[in-house]
Amino acid sequence: AVQFPDGGSITIIAVTTLSGGDITHAVPDNTGYITEGQLYLRRDSNVGKVIIDPFRSLSRLKQLVIGKKTREDHPQVMNAAVRLFSDAAGAQTKMENGFDLTDYDERTLSFAADYSRELLAIDVNIDTEQMLDTAWSLFGKYFRPAEVNIKQQLVDKYWPKA
């Protein structure tokens, strides 16, 4: 990356494709690049879109920005959304293995579909404020405040009004 004295920068974005989606392929495993972050894209068959996979993506710089240069609720919303998305992955596994799903499982699956479609899909183009507002809207649609596990002062301020 290059940063110019009068402002602006150029960042090199390397793209690695995996033959047949095989993440164990030797070429990407042996590149050895140290990056400031990576976005792992995959097709979400439940919504038919390519999404940013939050479990395999990483950012070494987010802690410098999130909640400091973004809205106060950003860290808690991010953590809650990823946790609920993870709960949905567990519910998906239960369903695939023939186990009964609880009401909570059903709601996490519905949440995950909307979360993928409205926030993780690569064709989504919204700013951070809209992203946070959308996440709160999804929380309110599928969960009770206690299930989301976000500080009460943030729930009081941002939870969607009925």
Q: What do the PLM-derived regions correspond to, one by one?
A:
Residues 1-162:
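P-loop NTPase catalytic core
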